[in-house]
Amino acid sequence: MDLPGPIHEILMLFGGFILLLGGLGVVLLTNPIYSAFSLGLVLVCISLFYFLLNSYFVAVAQLLIYVGAINVLIIFAVMFVNGSEWSKDKNYWTIGDGFTSLVCITFVFSLMTTIPDTSWYGILWTTRSNQIVEQGLINNVQQIGIHLATDFYLPFELISIILLVSLIGAITMARQ
């Protein structure tokens, strides 16, 4: 969005704060329904970031696919699971949880040290969507495809990975 600088920064900070609160809610809430609603809040905040970054198509795709479909699927799967099954476990911390936390923390710190040292110049696309063909000669579907393959390649791939993980999680929950 073309917003003045201070308003844009305030919306980014507000979205980041709500995103962090929602992420903590996903991880820390013991009721899976509340956790699923927190996940929906996180996905809406991610969509807000895409809107603020002028990626309207990716933002709408984020809302439709993740909030509209995946989050509803997760909520239905959680609602079909027996409620007493979640309240039986009183052991909140196991060795597997500690190992998983250690692996996640190691992964996050390795990303935090690797990303600033990476030369992003070689990764950037040398062609942009406006250099491929004249915009007036192609229709809207082709423009969307060109933008997805050039300008929005990284967000599109990240969204597809998140979709894959969500589907695997939903299938795993449905099997149990």
Swiss-Prot record:
Residue stretches spanning the membrane: 10-30, 33-53, 60-80, 95-115, 152-172
UniProt entry tagged with the keyword Membrane: yes
Enzyme class: translocase
InterPro entries listed in its UniProt record: NAD(P)H-Q_Oxidoreduct_6, NADH_UbQ/plastoQ_OxRdtase_su6, Nuo/plastoQ_OxRdtase_6_NuoJ
Similarity-based family: Belongs to the complex I subunit 6 family.
Physiological role: NDH shuttles electrons from NAD(P)H:plastoquinone, via FMN and iron-sulfur (Fe-S) centers, to quinones in the photosynthetic chain and possibly in a chloroplast respiratory chain. The immediate electron acceptor for the enzyme in this species is believed to be plastoquinone. Couples the redox reaction to proton translocation, and thus conserves the redox energy in a proton gradient.
Protein name: NAD(P)H-quinone oxidoreductase subunit 6, chloroplastic
Molecular function terms from GO: NADH dehydrogenase (ubiquinone) activity; quinone binding
Catalysed reaction equations from the record: a plastoquinone + NADH + (n+1) H(+)(in) = a plastoquinol + NAD(+) + n H(+)(out); a plastoquinone + NADPH + (n+1) H(+)(in) = a plastoquinol + NADP(+) + n H(+)(out)
EC number: 7.1.1.-
Keywords from the named record: Chloroplast, Membrane, NAD, NADP, Plastid, Plastoquinone, Quinone, Thylakoid, Translocase, Transmembrane, Transmembrane helix, Transport
Source taxon at top rank: Eukaryota
Topology relative to the membrane: Multi-pass membrane protein
Subunit comment: NDH is composed of at least 16 different subunits, 5 of which are encoded in the nucleus.
Keyword Disulfide bond attached: no
Pfam family, one: Oxidored_q3
Annotated GO CC locations: chloroplast thylakoid membrane
Intracellular or extracellular location(s): Plastid, Chloroplast thylakoid membrane
